[in-house]
From Swiss-Prot:
GO biological process: translation
One MF term in the entry's GO annotations: structural constituent of ribosome
Family matches, as InterPro entries: Ribosomal_bL35 (IPR001706), Ribosomal_bL35-like (IPR021137), Ribosomal_bL35_CS (IPR018265), Ribosomal_bL35_sf (IPR037229)
Region of interest (Disordered), ranges: 1-28
HAMAP family: Ribosomal_bL35
Name of the protein described by the UniProt record: Large ribosomal subunit protein bL35
Pfam families, per database record: Ribosomal_L35p
Amino acid sequence: MPKMKTHRGAAKRVKRTGSGQLKRSRAFTSHLFANKNTKQKRKLRKAKLVSKSDMKRVKQLLAYKK
């Protein structure tokens, strides 16, 4: 069986934390900020961990990423 390849799109969007969890940036941060209130914009700046339900799928995409 051939080697699995790391999904390059996913690899660029996700970083692994020291404890092995996966950190991602939030969506809705590229434009249309006039429609978003200050609290929402502040919360969008913070990174978020990949949810438990998505973890298995994302780990398959990142087979060899450390």
